[in-house]
UniProtKB/Swiss-Prot annotation:
Cofactor(s) it depends on: Mg(2+)
SUPFAM superfamilies in the record: ITPase-like
Residues that bind substrate: 8-13, 68, 146-149, 169, 174-175
CDD domains named among the record's database cross-references: HAM1
Organism encoding this protein: Synechocystis sp. (strain ATCC 27184 / PCC 6803 / Kazusa)
Protein name per Swiss-Prot or TrEMBL: dITP/XTP pyrophosphatase
GO cellular component: cytoplasm; cytosol
Length: 194
């Protein structure tokens, strides 16, 4: 089984991916720092594919990438692709989103994640998508997780992501769903063909 190059410079994302892919026993390593990929896609799918493909070609190895974000219905899908750039810090992003939703009663939202795997020639061999639907709270709750977790409420669990344990969140999150699909489709990958 090949080592997968993770198309990120973020060690936290590498650790998270290793947790999800642990059942497969594959090795993951961060992309070289000198490889920069500009996210110019207009969808999470395009950005995940772009990152995986460019990194795979640059290092001539298999690569994996994900792209994700929060889409709020009342804001026409914003912050969407710009979720990570909606402010400088998690606190700023949350404050900006809550301000944009002030006085809005319909607060449905979805976290979306797309995971893509590219062969050494850059061709995309597998992409999966996970969606987790919930609502945006009126104020932060919980101290686990990161990003928008304190304001993303899952009615069926009566908790925000930030109130869940890591294991609880992995079972229901957008990223968990995308990686679960990937694990089930993994046997179809033809690593020896490249």
């Amino acid at each position: 089984m090949p080592t997968l190059i993770v198309a990120t410079g973020n060690p936290g994302k590498l650790a998270e991916m290793q947790t999800y892919l642990e059942p497969l026993g594959c090795q993951l390593t961060l992309k070289p720092t000198e490889i920069e990929v500009e996210e110019t896609g207009s969808t999470f799918y395009e950005n995940a594919c772009l990152k995986a493909s460019q990194v795979a070609k640059a290092v001539n190895q298999w690569a994996i990438a994900d792209d994700s974000g929060l889409a709020v219905d009342a804001l026409d899908g914003a912050p969407g692709l710009y979720s990570a750039r909606y402010g400088n810090t998690d606190r700023e992003r949350i404050a900006k989103l809550l301000q944009a939703l002030e006085g809005v009663s319909q607060r449905q939202a979805q976290f979306i994640c797309v995971v893509s795997i590219a062969a050494p020639d850059g061709s995309i061999q597998l992409s999966t998508k996970g969606i987790c639907s919930g609502e945006i709270t009126h104020s932060p709750r919980g101290d686990q997780g990161f990003g928008y977790d304190p304001i993303f409420w899952l009615p069926e669990h009566k908790k925000t992501f930030a109130e869940m344990t890591k294991v609880e969140k992995q079972k229901v999150s957008h990223r968990g769903k995308a990686f679960n699909k990937l694990i089930h489709q993994w046997p179809g990958l033809k690593f020896d063909s490249f």
